[in-house]
């Protein structure tokens, strides 16, 4: 359990560094850069795009330590510049709680059948042409598995790929407990009720932590895509309530991660389309659009190489 907590917290700090890097490159007003809890989403997609490109040429295991350390360096810069606004103790408490209750979770069937294998292929080998010909299950091209492949570290019998899924859940509950500008808003109420449902369902279910929480401790994608769907809907409501560019940015990136994590969540794309077109809320100089197009292109190319199909 302590390994799980330490690994997740270290990766969390590294992701904050990549969040700073992302905002430094993409933000329209660099003098207004401030890193908060939800900005970790930027860090996640930055690591994923680096991994997607790198895996065309090398196995991700070759750069795992480098990527982690670079993120830590940028995180230290945010501390030096005092541009980070996160309750680190609060995040640690929530993370420790989930690491504790998920410690005894076992592996599910899907993990052994194909999740671990798809992670292994990205971690140990550069991209393989026609990988799905070996097994149709290898056609799963989840960006979350790419993310896990980057941060795959093994210490004795402990392997980080089994526990990193706890991070998105921690981000969700941190926002519920520590967000101070959401009171009495529908967006916050939606987020709060989503958290209550997850906890209540876990208590009601007769077997261990319930069907949903029993998935944790596995390198699966169902719970991760679920969390990003909840966050995407939250950002969608925030866009309607406050009409701020930062929430549209988060909505767009969160939706992309959600879809590319599990394609069955593709309906989430309706949220950013609605805000951008139906609501007529246009935002100027959005470099994030160019990034999103580039990210999608790389993901489609990877799909085509693995399966001869773009999706």
Segments predicted by a language model, with ranges:
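Membrane-interface transmembrane helices that cradle and orient dolichyl/undecaprenyl
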Residues: 224, 229-248
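Membrane-embedded, hydrophobic transmembrane alpha-helices
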Residues: 1-84
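Membrane-interface alpha helices of multi-pass inner-membrane proteins
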Residues: 51-55, 247-263, 267-274, 294, ...
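Membrane-interfacial entry segments at the cytosolic side of transmembrane helices
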Residues: 60-64, 83-90, 185-189, 246, ...
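Perimembrane helix-loop-helix junctions
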Residues: 72-83, 268-293
């Amino acid at each position: 359990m302590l390994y799980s907590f330490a690994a997740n917290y270290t990766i969390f700090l590294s992701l904050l560094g990549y969040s700073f890097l992302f905002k430094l490159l993409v933000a329209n007003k660099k003098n207004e850069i401030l890193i908060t809890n939800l900005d970790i989403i930027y860090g996640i997609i930055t690591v994923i795009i680096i991994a997607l490109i790198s895996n065309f040429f090398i196995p991700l295991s070759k750069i795992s330590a480098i990527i982690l350390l670079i993120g830590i360096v940028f995180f230290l810069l945010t501390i030096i510049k005092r541009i980070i606004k996160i309750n680190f103790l609060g995040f640690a408490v929530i993370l420790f709680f989930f690491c504790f209750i998920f410690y005894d979770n076992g592996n599910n069937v899907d993990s052994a059948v194909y999740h671990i294998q798809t992670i292994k292929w990205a971690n140990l080998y550069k991209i393989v042409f026609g990988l799905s010909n070996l097994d149709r299950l290898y056609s799963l091209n989840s960006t979350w598995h790419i993310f896990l492949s980057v941060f795959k570290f093994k210490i004795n019998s402990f392997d980080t790929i089994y526990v990193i899924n706890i991070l998105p859940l921690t981000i969700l509950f941190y926002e519920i407990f520590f967000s101070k500008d959401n009171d009495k808003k529908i967006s916050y109420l939606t987020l709060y009720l989503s958290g209550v449902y997850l906890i209540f369902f876990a208590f009601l279910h007769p077997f261990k932590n319930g069907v949903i929480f029993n998935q944790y401790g596995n390198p699966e994608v169902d719970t991760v895509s679920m969390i990003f769907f909840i966050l995407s809907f939250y950002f969608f409501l925030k866009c309607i309530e406050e009409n701020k560019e930062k929430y549209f940015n988060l909505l767009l990136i969160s939706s992309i991660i959600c879809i590319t994590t599990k394609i069955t969540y593709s309906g989430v794309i309706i949220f950013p389309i609605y805000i951008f077109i139906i609501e007529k809320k246009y935002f100027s100089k959005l470099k994030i659009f160019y990034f999103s197009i580039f990210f999608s292109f790389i993901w489609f190319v990877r799909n085509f190489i693995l399966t001869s199909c773009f999706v």
